[in-house]
Amino acid sequence: MNSINYAIIGFGGIARNHALAAYDANLRHNLPYSLNLSYIVTRKPIEISVPGITNVTNLQTVLEDPNLDFISICTPNESHVDIVEQAIAYGKPIYCEKPLASTLLDAEKMNKLVHENNVINGVAFIYRFLPAIALLKEELEKKTIGSIIDFKIKTYHNSYLNKEKQGTWRTLKTSGGGALLDLGSHLIDLIHYTLGNIKEIQYQSRIHFKDRSEVDEITRGEILLDNGTLGSVEASRVFAEEIQTDQMILFGTTGSMKLDLTNPYIIQIHDFNTGSTLYKAVPEKHPSMRFYPKERNSLGFFQNCHTAAIIDFANKLNGMKDTIGADFTDGLKCQEVISKLK
């Protein structure tokens, strides 16, 4: 396969990260194929100044193109299921922005469709591609801090303090949820990916700006994993700090591990027995750095992760077996946990 051609469905903010990923991938990584953005599908025509990209307003036109290898869904949550149904009819592989859907019922339907029709699928849970997460998983396997007593993972964003967010699609009930679905879904996937499946969760949730949002702005969840480990997750869209909080902390019987999700090259390991703290950096030759740039070449952790995630999905299409990206089954697992928020 000399080229992998894809179409982005929708062209809001997150779609631009999916688009930039193709150019970043081709310019900075020695791929066995060229990753090409061929189409951008929008409801109304837009001007595209980049050569080689065609803007269309009819999804079927794109799906009928035999040279199209996959679609990337970047539309509001409630529209995902309809787009997946259309793509399935043409057998097109599907890469979908998180969350998988706006409702558990839609997520179940989407997962069933791709499996019944043997369609390759992926979900953009991009935090999996942070090199520090790969390092954390290795340290967990080595039991560097003993058995896990507790964990805390949280993300505090401030964007919905902006009054202009009132009435935007992510503030409406039709989106399926607020801070937990939008931000917390990344965290829930990280818990599943690094620590194990969530067995039980109890939520506390609130809306502070009731005139602006119909969905949760702050949500905390107390968690019990299948293996008996306790922990918590917290997501907010209305917490302002000098430096944004995106943090994961694990407390073990012989110490702790901490990482800042926005600083993807280092984990902090504290040893209770010696009282020492090690700041362990990800080696430049580490497997997790294969499609992730060195710190001096970073475009920011968010874009870096999007690029790595789309390369991973393209690699799956190209027949590679060592991919780590989330799929619709993983997306459904997250949706099941989120759906327990009433």
Residue spans for each PLM region:
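Beta-loop-alpha module in the N-terminal Rossmann-like domain of NAD(P)-dependent dehydrogenases
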Residues: 51-113, 305
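C-terminal glycine/acidic-rich active-site capping loop/insertion
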Residues: 126, 225, 249, 254-325
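Rossmann-fold dehydrogenase core element
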Residues: 4, 109-126, 146-151
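Predominantly a Rossmann-like dinucleotide-binding segment in NAD(P)-dependent oxidoreductases
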Residues: 127-213
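N-terminal Rossmann-like dinucleotide-binding module
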Residues: 1-51
